């Protein structure tokens, strides 16, 4: 929760979203999230699927804790970059909504 005290708008975790026994990022983050954002998770997988068939195996997780956007993305540099490409700049609208702005 240090990020909250620092006033972070976004926290990005990379790695641990695959299927091996040590890939536990989604399980670690899920109980901490106030709400998931399944549409952003779907956008990440869909965007990746256009580039590699293995993206369907990714378990990226997206949600919010209070007014902070939390992203659990693939650990590979390319996977993380493509995930960010998939959701930005549209993800910026999340901050407007969290601060009481319109949809």
Short names for language-model regions:
Residues 1-103:
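Non-catalytic beta/alpha edge segments that cap or flank active sites
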């Amino acid at each position: 929760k240090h990020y909250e005290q620092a006033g972070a708008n976004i926290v990005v975790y990379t790695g641990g979203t695959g299927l091996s026994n040590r890939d536990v990022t989604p399980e670690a983050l899920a109980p901490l999230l106030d709400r998931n954002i399944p549409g952003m998770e779907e956008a990440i997988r869909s965007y990746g699927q256009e580039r590699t068939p293995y993206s369907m195996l990714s378990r990226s997780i997206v949600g919010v804790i209070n007014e902070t956007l939390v992203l659990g993305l693939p650990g590979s540099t390319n996977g993380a970059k493509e995930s960010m490409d998939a959701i930005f700049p549209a993800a910026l609208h999340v901050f407007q909504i969290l601060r009481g702005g319109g949809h």
